[in-house]
Amino acid sequence: MSTNKVRRLVALAARWNGPISVAVKVISIQDFREFQSLLHAHQEHLKKVAFHLYFESRHRDYPNNILRNLALDRVQSDYFALFDVDLLPSPMNTHQHLRSTFDDNPQLEDRLKDKTVFILPAWEIEEEISNEDITIQHPLYPETKEMVLKMNGEKMSDRKLRIFRHVFEPGHRSTDYPKWTSNNTDISYPIEAEEYGYEPYIIGAMKDAPRFFRDFRGYGFNKLSYYVELHYAKYSMEVLRDFFIFHVNHPSTYGEERTKSRMVNMVCVKTFMEYLARDYGAGYLDDEEEVAGLETWRRRMAQGQGTGDYYEEAEEEEEDESEDEDE
């Protein structure tokens, strides 16, 4: 995460009420001092948070996957929950509630150990809330599944909550929200990633879990590449029926810089595909090995002119929505 996201982390830590491993990008001594001051002011809610600092100047694109790996590598438990600092759990979806659910349903833990990841359905609040206005409790927060169903009313005009993320629906659509809202399933239900772009928030086992492909920076492909790798590593996906997280919406920072970093990452796709072929024997040119939407990757890969370091040629800026906390 960036140092300006401390208020969001405080809300997350207070509601999660369990161990968190978070990697923080620091760009200067002044940035570090301001970060220290914020931590001191909010220390009451950050006692279970382990901070791992990554120092890098602003001139390069935001190191999304480097930070994710830094946090993930320092998780002390057998399992992890992976989500961004802009997402919050409800009081019924805390660390303790998840542990109790897995203790009461040992088959879930068995599946975790057998290369299954469990998906936490993600929603987002329609109304934007700035960093300065983030609080632990808020009238707009859905605190139960019943509230989610009510806030996501049948009439569009009545909706205060929507499926995450409306600006890129393939990112979470494979979660099968109609099935989740029906409540007519077992404690979890299996799904398939049926379209390009699926990048849910998950619970997984630390043992042998892949790491994020570190070459991707800034906007585009950085988190998505992880789920492509899970596919080739033969992981299964299941959705937890009684759990959810929600995105606290904020003003968009999309602009020309993001477009440029997306173009830079298109070049990295070629390197990523070579890695999949080498480590997994991924026949990414064979139809029978096709992952959903991989033709899109192949087309973008063809636009790359090599695998050199193109970062210095781009006007780079931090990517605001790429911070991860792990159980």
Q: Model-found features: residue ranges?
A:
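Short active-site alpha-helical segment characteristic of glycosyltransferases
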Residues: 226, 230
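Conserved catalytic core of nucleotide-sugar-dependent glycosyltransferases
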Residues: 58-59, 63, 67-68, 72-73, ...
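Catalytic donor-sugar/metal-binding loop of nucleotide-sugar-dependent glycosyltransferases
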Residues: 231-245
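N-terminal anchoring/stem segment of glycosyltransferases
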Residues: 1-59
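Short aromatic/hydrophobic "clamp" motif used to bind/position activated sugar donors
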Residues: 80
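Acidic, Ser/Thr-interspersed intrinsically disordered low-complexity regions
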Residues: 310-327
